[in-house]
């Protein structure tokens, strides 16, 4: 299976991705490293696709992944209906240059 390891154990990596995706859906955009951004984008796209069909089962699946209940409400009431006619591609990654400390490529991940 193809995915980024991000230099962390499985539990830490999953917790970090859950935090990134929760922040992305809450704020609309996040700044992070390129590898983290690509991983977060993939998960966010799947959750937004899930939110296009507002059922109890889909809400519970989203709630099992996201940390905040208010973000799940926003996902199903605002974000899902906004992209109802769009067949994917709900987020965009924009490179913003290297980080000053270690030169890691930083990106802006944002909802369209």
Swiss-Prot record:
Listed Pfam families: Ribosomal_L17
GO annotation (BP), single: translation
Signal peptide span: none
KW Ribosomal protein (keyword) present: yes
Keyword annotations of the record: Ribonucleoprotein, Ribosomal protein
GO molecular function terms attached to this record: structural constituent of ribosome
InterPro entries, per database record: Ribosomal_bL17, Ribosomal_bL17_CS, Ribosomal_bL17_sf
GO cellular component terms, A-Z: cytosolic large ribosomal subunit
Alphabetical list of NCBIfam families matching this protein: L17 (TIGR00059)
Family: Belongs to the bacterial ribosomal protein bL17 family.
Summary of subunit composition and partner proteins: Part of the 50S ribosomal subunit. Contacts protein L32.
Name assigned to this protein: Large ribosomal subunit protein bL17
Upper lineage: Bacteria, Bacillati, Bacillota, Clostridia, Thermoanaerobacterales
